[in-house]
């Protein structure tokens, strides 16, 4: 947990940032935004073989109950406003994971007139998971990278 010092008599000293970030990494609640074949791999990651619950990751049906959005698949121009609307409904602090080549940069359909060339043109993306489609292991690795990123962030504002 990043303990800075241990005092005598059983007291532990640490920063509030460390405690808050530790709690946030152990309770990511993603809402799924499955648009194409990558969504099937996302479903595999939630099933018994990979079991995202062991990381504290529980899929939520509503964006108002979630703090992470997993964008999986080809994002079209018609779907971009809906993606932004779902992102705006996420609870703060919120994170976005872009899953698959199509969500990362348009993928196979990059030159199509109707495809957005990356989810990062609509919402800020924190972690990119490459692949077409990426495996469930790759998604889990991306989620672990997001947890590491959350642990490194400053939560409480400091006067400098």
Curated annotation (Swiss-Prot):
Family membership noted in the UniProt record: Belongs to the complex I 20 kDa subunit family.
Listed HAMAP family: NDH1_NuoB (MF_01356)
Entry GO CC: plasma membrane; respiratory chain complex I
Keywords: 4Fe-4S, Cell inner membrane, Cell membrane, Iron, Iron-sulfur, Membrane, Metal-binding, NAD, Quinone, Translocase, Transport, Ubiquinone
Catalyzed reactions per annotation: a quinone + NADH + 5 H(+)(in) = a quinol + NAD(+) + 4 H(+)(out)
Membrane topology value: Peripheral membrane protein
Residues engaged in binding [4Fe-4S] cluster: 37-38, 102, 132
UniProt keyword Manganese, yes or no: no
Protein name: NADH-quinone oxidoreductase subunit B
UniProt-listed Enzyme Commission number(s): 7.1.1.-
GO MF entries: 4 iron, 4 sulfur cluster binding; iron ion binding; NADH dehydrogenase (ubiquinone) activity; NADH:ubiquinone reductase (non-electrogenic) activity; quinone binding
Bilayer-spanning residue ranges: none
Cofactor note: Binds 1 [4Fe-4S] cluster.
Source organism per UniProt: Neisseria gonorrhoeae (strain ATCC 700825 / FA 1090)
GO biological process: aerobic respiration; electron transport coupled proton transport
Localization (cell): Cell inner membrane
Main location: membrane
UniProt subunit comment: NDH-1 is composed of 14 different subunits. Subunits NuoB, C, D, E, F, and G constitute the peripheral sector of the complex.
Functional description taken from the UniProt entry: NDH-1 shuttles electrons from NADH, via FMN and iron-sulfur (Fe-S) centers, to quinones in the respiratory chain. Couples the redox reaction to proton translocation (for every two electrons transferred, four hydrogen ions are translocated across the cytoplasmic membrane), and thus conserves the redox energy in a proton gradient.
Alphabetical list of NCBIfam families matching this protein: nuoB_fam (TIGR01957), PRK06411.1 (NF005012)
Domain of life: Bacteria
